[in-house]
Amino acid sequence: MNFETVIGLEVHVELNTNSKIFSPTSAHFGNDQNANTNVIDWSFPGVLPVLNKGVVDAGIKAALALNMDIHKKMHFDRKNYFYPDNPKAYQISQFDEPIGYNGWIEVELEDGTTKKIGIERAHLEEDAGKNTHGTDGYSYVDLNRQGVPLIEIVSEADMRSPEEAYAYLTALKEVIQYAGISDVKMEEGSMRVDANISLRPYGQEKFGTKTELKNLNSFSNVRKGLEYEVQRQAEILRSGGQIRQETRRYDEANKATILMRVKEGAADYRYFPEPDXPLFEIXDEWIEEMRTELPEFPKERRARYVSDLGLSDYDASQLTANKVTSDFFEKAVALDGDAKQVSNWLQGEVAQFLNAEGKTLEQIELTPENLVEMIAIIEDGTISSKIAKKVFVHLAKNGGGAREYVEKAGMVQISDPAILIPIIHQVFADNEAAVVDFKSGKRNADKAFTGFLMKATKGQANPQVALKLLAQELAKLKEN
């Protein structure tokens, strides 16, 4: 029997506001334990939450970017549960009326086709703290993350393969990043994914029993975990067994999903309206203000790069996959940088350097200005493409002007015949055996002189000019 895969994803995204959702403390990642806390985060008696307007701004932008309807009558709810990293014993979230609902996103699949994935809802909530378990036998609670604003985006169960789930996450990350509401860095926990997967016989409308997957710390692991689950569940069903409703985690080392707990039924969080956060209305003017702040999104940028700048579909997709890279490209082209050359550098030498250094484009000293200047001095013959790679590394590490560095470092190409011809004659004098081979008609003997000349000029001879002059002087040599 063949089965149809049914997948839905729940994605938690940390919003990049300066302060938390209900307290004025910093929402910055990476500070010392409990440095970003105050009496609200610790839930001292008598303290009251104060809603950060910037969080609602971000929620509206997310809803608009994901083609969602917006609930204009806004309220929050209490989700009641006890855990050490949740000092209030409840989480302020949204239950029956999320900020956004009934949305969709179009994703591009590996075969070049597109598919529209439905988004059921997007709701705002506060994050919980973090428990760590020490080797000394004690457990510790860090509340830096407590109260950091989240938006949870819940898809419809519209994905029919791990490939589609991967494509959905890729598209969702792009949209959220371009909207400017999160840096969506999975390695820092600002984007977290839970997956729900079930199988059903083809043609059956009723969903099968679902399994929830956690510990999915990369898009690649989401895909691998789902692929494993498809195989595991299919084997159970084909052997006459039944799928249990359970939560499993993906074990990267063993490339398998591991049971965490069996779900006996849906958790009862006893939701009720949050009494300490008043009702408020999102007026049409507020929504339109947020709409005007939304940028051009990846799909539109890709189309423009192809139609207006003459880039290939592949180059356009690569450039727009990351907003930082795309914005860098935009600035470089605005400075009259050649679009194809800038694209080639960003996808080639720049990408290789970032991978080798383990850095992002924001963390190096390269700027659109000095990259465009470097490309210009390649084009005007000041430096060769080979020398340019060394210049780029210097710019990436130290910044500054490309032309200024090249001149100070003595890297300017030698293009003057008055300088090159005496060097060519000296090459002949220093390599008498090669001259004899050339005059005797030995095959490819002339090519050796190219290497000798480049060595003599320390690679600074302009290749086009040097080869032309070398051919000219070799012809004279043969006549003598």
Curated annotation (Swiss-Prot):
PROSITE patterns: GATB. Pfam families: GatB_N, GatB_Yqey. Its EC number is 6.3.5.-. It catalyses: L-glutamyl-tRNA(Gln) + L-glutamine + ATP + H2O = L-glutaminyl-tRNA(Gln) + L-glutamate + ADP + phosphate + H(+); L-aspartyl-tRNA(Asn) + L-glutamine + ATP + H2O = L-asparaginyl-tRNA(Asn) + L-glutamate + ADP + phosphate + 2 H(+). One of its GO terms (biological process) is translation. Keywords: ATP-binding, Ligase, Nucleotide-binding, Protein biosynthesis. GO terms for molecular function: asparaginyl-tRNA synthase (glutamine-hydrolyzing) activity; ATP binding; glutaminyl-tRNA synthase (glutamine-hydrolyzing) activity. InterPro entries: Asn/Gln-tRNA_amidoTrfase_suB/E, Asn/Gln-tRNA_Trfase_suB/E_cat, Asn/Gln_amidotransferase, Asn/Gln_tRNA_amidoTrase-B-like, GatB, GatB_C_1, GatB_Yqey_C_2, Gln-tRNA_amidoTrfase_suB_CS. Heterotrimer of A, B and C subunits. Belongs to the GatB/GatE family. GatB subfamily. PANTHER family: GLUTAMYL-TRNA GLN AMIDOTRANSFERASE SUBUNIT B MITOCHONDRIAL AND PROKARYOTIC PET112-RELATED (PTHR11659), GLUTAMYL-TRNA(GLN) AMIDOTRANSFERASE SUBUNIT B, MITOCHONDRIAL (PTHR11659:SF0). Allows the formation of correctly charged Asn-tRNA(Asn) or Gln-tRNA(Gln) through the transamidation of misacylated Asp-tRNA(Asn) or Glu-tRNA(Gln) in organisms which lack either or both of asparaginyl-tRNA or glutaminyl-tRNA synthetases. The reaction takes place in the presence of glutamine and ATP through an activated phospho-Asp-tRNA(Asn) or phospho-Glu-tRNA(Gln). This is Aspartyl/glutamyl-tRNA(Asn/Gln) amidotransferase subunit B.
